């Protein structure tokens, strides 16, 4: 698979332009996208206008719709905020840390026959500027800001975009399908009824 000749992005805007070039292709080179996102050095001046926090839960803030090929968003995690265990609806998911630390816990898909709880398969702590990747063939994950003193900010790319996902109960393995919404779009708060969701990851 051919790789686009890319320069290291100096700004978030540069990164977005290069992502648009890469996603003109019908196929996706996971390593290329991950390397590109990792090569961007986080600069709060680039992304602060998109970083909208909520006191009670983490937020999803849309940055770019990627001509329908991908969604790029910034997630803001207050102290102790975390996601449910969830899938990614057959999409590629790239997660780059812009500020703070996030703990990612991986899980295998639950065995429907056993009706048993879900045991963590592995954990890692993402540091600033690191990038992680997951898709449904690799399993499920939960993301948490375990700090009680520092917020965290992460940049997520989903391709193709999706509007719902499945969240899982760790004790039973049962799942629910939930609709996801944006707390803000392009730096502007979305109407309240459009931004409330059961699970906003």
Curated annotation (Swiss-Prot):
Co-factor note (free text) = Binds 1 Fe cation per subunit. Ni(2+) and Zn(2+) can be used to a lesser extent.
Query: What family is it from?
Result: Belongs to the cysteine dioxygenase family.
Pathway assigned in UniProt: Organosulfur biosynthesis; taurine biosynthesis; hypotaurine from L-cysteine: step 1/2
Q: Say where the cross-link 3'-(S-cysteinyl)-tyrosine (Cys-Tyr) occurs.
A: 93-158
Quote the subunit structure annotation: Monomer.
Against Gene3D superfamilies, the record matches this protein to: Jelly Rolls
Identification of the protein by name: Cysteine dioxygenase type 1
User: Which keywords accompany this UniProt record?
Assistant: Dioxygenase, Iron, Metal-binding, Oxidoreductase, Thioether bond
Q: Is the Lipoprotein keyword given for this protein?
A: no
Q: Where does Fe cation bind?
A: 86, 88, 141
Cross-referenced InterPro entries: CDO_1, RmlC-like_jellyroll, RmlC_Cupin_sf
- Biological process annotations from GO: L-cysteine catabolic process; taurine biosynthetic process
Task of the protein: Catalyzes the oxidation of cysteine to cysteine sulfinic acid with addition of molecular dioxygen.
């Amino acid at each position: 698979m051919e790789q686009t000749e890319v320069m290291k992005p100096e700004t978030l805007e540069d990164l977005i332009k290069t992502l648009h070039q890469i996603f003109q292709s019908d196929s996706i080179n996971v390593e290329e996208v991950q390397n590109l996102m990792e090569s961007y050095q986080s600069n709060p001046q680039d992304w602060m206008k998109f970083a909208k926090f909520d006191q009670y839960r983490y937020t999803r803030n849309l940055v770019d719709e990627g001509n329908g090929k991908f969604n790029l968003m910034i997630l803001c995690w207050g102290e102790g905020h975390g996601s449910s265990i969830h899938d990614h609806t057959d999409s590629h998911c790239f997660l780059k840390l812009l500020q703070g630390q996030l703990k990612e816990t991986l899980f295998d898909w639950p065995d429907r026959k056993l009706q048993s709880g879900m045991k963590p398969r592995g954990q890692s702590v993402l540091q600033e500027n690191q990038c992680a990747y997951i898709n449904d063939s690799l399993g499920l994950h939960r993301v948490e800001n375990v700090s009680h003193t520092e917020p965290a900010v992460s940049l997520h790319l989903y391709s193709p975009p999706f509007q719902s996902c499945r969240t899982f109960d760790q004790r039973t393995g049962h799942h629910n399908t939930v609709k996801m919404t944006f707390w803000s779009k392009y730096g502007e708060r979305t109407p309240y009824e459009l931004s409330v969701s059961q699970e906003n990851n």
